[in-house]
Amino acid sequence: LSHGHYDHGNGLARFLEVNDHAQIYINRHASGQYYYRSERYIGIDPEVIRTLSESGRVVFTDDTYIIDDELSLCTCNDKTSVFPVDNAGLTEKIGDTFVPDRFLHEQYLVINDKTHISQTEKSVIGRRIVLSGCSHKGILNIVNWLRPDVLIGGFHFMDIDVSSGYSDVLNKAAEVLMTEHEGRTPTMFYTCHCTGAAQYSYLKKRMCDRLEYLSSGQTVEI
């Protein structure tokens, strides 16, 4: 589970009914009190958390969790943001006080692909593939911290206004995403969900074949 918001986690109780074996990895902060401003609760339903806890199939993770030689989960909570992050009104309730969400509950799946064959060098090379949910800590920060060869996830750009045909924020994002590889093979990006259709189209014009859109049920070969 990428983070503790209802639109990502509330379906897990139903998932347990239709799947009788898979383990679910949830960060221990995912059961926190998360809101949009102070007006609307957007965290996972406490009843779902209870069902998950009692299922015996949930692994509650901390900042880093190693699943096996290829798969690991990390929060990057110990990292310092290099690029500014807009919380977009997302908060957490601590006691009786609402504060900007620190997104301690957000985690990323890192896949260390040790079997990829380079089409140019015809040799086996390692690749790092990162899966992010909504990238609340900032897609630019995540790329800076994890240095992926492939990144799949939402960019959380859906509220950025592109109606004028120009956006400083998206221009900066495209520039950084296109150059943040420093001697490595340039990162390939697949995006979806909270990026926004108009925002994706804006980025696509600037990132060209380095950015593709994903839809539910779609299969891509990376």
Which residues are covered by each model-predicted region?
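Active-site-proximal loop/helix segment associated with metal-binding centers of metalloenzymes
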Residues: 38-41, 63-126
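Short acidic/glycine-rich loop or secondary-structure boundary segments that cap or lie
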Residues: 34, 68, 81-84, 138-141, ...
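Cap/insert and terminal regions of metallo-dependent hydrolase folds
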Residues: 104-108, 112-220
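A short helix-to-beta-strand connector/capping loop
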Residues: 20, 51-57, 68-69, 185, ...
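Active-site HxH/HxHxD metal-binding segment of metal-dependent hydrolases
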Residues: 2-63, 77-85
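Divalent metal-coordination and catalytic microenvironments
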Residues: 3, 24, 70, 133, ...
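Short amphipathic alpha-helices and their capping/turn segments at secondary-structure boundaries
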Residues: 12-17, 64-68, 141-146
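Hydrophobic/aromatic beta-strand patches that form the interior of the parallel beta-sheet core
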Residues: 25, 59, 72-74, 152, ...
